[in-house]
Design a protein with these regions (language model features):
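ATP-dependent helicase/translocase motor core
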Residues: 120-410
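Amphipathic alpha-helical interface elements
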Residues: 1-153
């Protein structure tokens, strides 16, 4: 069998070996597969320190090393998530004898993609992506001499460190530029996107696990839990046979729908299509979770993302896009992070229309009074323009005023 990791043999044989062994163990020895995949992440992190002559952190743990490389600007948030995912699953495999063929299939393509990024950043800058092919189920590894295997891995790791230490020093600005370019061009599957979304949701307080917290596995809204339930059924006829990628529940209240897409998709168009259709098509048996209706919608908030951090230059193909369905004139907007369960409840409780009404009716007496701020007409016009931007739902506004015209007072 040709390994997906063969492209590493010349420049990084240690990574090629770990990847090939992980593929061979995938179905016959999942525990060993996950350990090999974890070693890919650990080896890449250690080699990055050596190639770039970066001092290891004082608290020289795996977490601290990954975090330092992130602070140095060498790792994007999606790569950090993959490295931590590989680290965590390896720890479970080592310390709990954990095994899961489903996790093998999740992490194998992600480890391959990570290796492609590493090749493009620390090896051949002109390397071109090759699609990952999942090993066939009849791939079985024969009798393995574990002692000989460990000896080979140790020798290859030592060789890799020697090669990294002897490599020409690349200017840090050039390395960061190449690392960013390779990360930005790295293809992501919907499975990886889901993995990244799970991580991001957990960080802000949601219980999220696409593989286990699924409707088909019996997960249901539960009092006291903030659940992101994967593959939630609706009556929609569009998309994934009517299954929303995630339904968000604060306790037993249905507050949001998430649609996850591959990186090449235009995200706002997903909001307008599946993102709006799923909230229209909530099943009758799920109406007990509906907190209100807004026209044809039975869910207040809808989201779409591809797991990619928000980039202004790739505005419609990055970030988390959000639409508040409670008002028909609301437009989709890009967020830089997920809303927490508390944040959603606060937004639901906020009387935005009432506050906008108060803002419109607020007197300008203090602003115009000679004993007050005594603002000039152009300053009042600037304030009115800013208020209009707020009332219309804009997230940003820019006031341009010349030097000496009272910007601070305005």
């Amino acid at each position: 069998m040709v390994s997906n990791f063969d492209f590493l043999k010349k420049d990084f044989p240690v990574l090629s070996n770990f990847g090939e062994m992980a593929e061979k163990y995938c179905y016959s020895d999942s525990n060993s597969c996950l350990m090999k995949l974890g070693m890919i992440g650990e080896t890449i992190v250690n080699l990055m320190f050596t190639y770039d002559r970066i001092a290891f952190p004082h608290d020289n743990t795996a977490v601290a090393r990954i975090d330092k490389l992130s602070r140095e600007g060498l790792l994007t948030s999606d790569l950090v998530a993959i490295l931590h995912g590989l680290r965590k699953v390896r720890n479970k495999a080592v310390h709990e004898n954990y095994a899961s063929i489903a996790d093998d299939k999740t992490f194998l393509p992600m480890a391959h993609s990570l290796c492609e990024w590493f090749m493009q950043t620390y090896g051949d800058w002109n390397y071109s992506h090759k699609d990952f092919v999942m090993p066939e189920e009849n791939t079985v590894l024969g009798t393995v001499d574990k002692e000989a295997e460990e000896k080979k891995e140790s020798e290859l790791t030592k060789l890799a460190e020697q090669m990294a230490a002897a490599a020409p020093i690349i200017e840090q600005t050039e390395r960061k530029k190449q690392a960013y370019k390779a990360a930005n061009q790295r293809p992501k599957t919907e499975a990886e996107t889901r993995f990244l979304i799970d991580e991001q949701l957990r960080m802000v307080g949601w219980d999220a696990d696409t593989e286990n917290l699924r409707y088909s596995k019996g997960t249901r809204p539960t009092k006291g839990r903030n659940l992101a339930i994967a593959e939630y059924p609706t009556n929609s006829k569009v998309g994934n046979r009517g299954y929303a990628d995630y339904a968000l529940f604060v306790g037993e209240k249905l507050v949001g729908i998430i649609e996850a897409k591959a990186i090449h998709k235009d995200i706002p168009s997903v909001i307008d299509y599946q993102g709006k259709d799923y909230p229209r098509c909530i099943r009758k048996e799920d109406e007990k979770y509906v907190i209100d209706t807004w026209g044809e919608f039975k869910v207040p908030f809808t989201f779409a993302t591809n797991g990619r951090p928000y980039l202004e230059q790739y505005k419609t193909k990055s970030g988390i896009w959000f639409l508040d369905l409670r008002k028909p004139d609301n437009s989709p907007m890009a967020l830089r992070g997920w809303m927490s369960p508390d944040g959603m409840e606060e937004l639901l409780a906020a009387d935005i229309e009432g506050k906008n009404k108060n803002l419109k009716e607020m007197s300008y007496d203090l602003l115009t009074d000679k004993d007050g701020l005594n603002l000039r007409p152009y300053q009042l016009n600037a304030i009115r323009a800013a208020e209009e931007a707020v009332i219309s739902g804009k997230q940003t506004a820019l006031l341009a005023m010349a030097t000496g015209t009272g910007k601070t007072r305005t």
